[in-house]
Amino acid sequence: MSKTGGKISFYEDRNFQGRRYDCDCDCADFRSYLSRCNSIRVEGGTWAVYERPNFSGHMYILPQGEYPEYQRWMGLNDRLGSCRAVHLSSGGQAKIQVFEKGDFNGQMYETTEDCPSIMEQFHLREIHSCKVVEGTWIFYELPNYRGRQYLLDKKEYRKPVDWGAASPAIQSFRRIVE
């Protein structure tokens, strides 16, 4: 199918109408192919799509499926500029350690499960650093997997800017599973 094992198709109009751009690998700027994006079909894999070129701006994680209008992927508007395949770890294992302070200081909580509310589950108001031990995770700025999203691969994140955030305002997180 592709270099990534997946394929994503972007359509200018709702319900998979209008000009189409197919992608099977990371693309830093597809604005020259489409002036707007109102529907998406993910035919394989999980993809991160970004509001602006060079993998910047609001990010949306899209598993395989059909998105007939931008509201279905929680898009703010019909503007997208780049995409990349999300590389999932083999075996489906997932483990993350979250810390109440930067540089892995303060109280640490480890989990292998999704967390809809860090306040309810860990009695934390914010996450200042974390270690992704296994798997790929998404941080959300609001409880119940809402708000701005941040994609975290297996590595250490000493401060919020390391995962692309301006502040530690993370309120929920979940694993990406196949």
Curated annotation (Swiss-Prot):
Record-level Gene Ontology MF annotations: structural constituent of eye lens
Function: Crystallins are the dominant structural components of the vertebrate eye lens.
SUPFAM superfamilies in UniProt: gamma-Crystallin-like (SSF49695)
PROSITE patterns according to UniProt: CRYSTALLIN_BETA_GAMMA
Protein name (database record): Gamma-crystallin S
Region (N-terminal arm): 2-5
Summary of subunit composition and partner proteins: Monomer.
Organism from which the protein derives: Mus musculus
InterPro entries per record: Beta/Gamma-Crystallin, Beta/gamma_crystallin, G_crystallin-like
Residues recorded with modification N-acetylserine: 2
Record keywords: Acetylation, Eye lens protein, Repeat
Region (Connecting peptide): 88-93
Gene transcribed to yield this protein: Crygs
GO biological process per UniProt: lens development in camera-type eye; morphogenesis of an epithelium
Domains: entry comment: Has a two-domain beta-structure, folded into four very similar Greek key motifs.
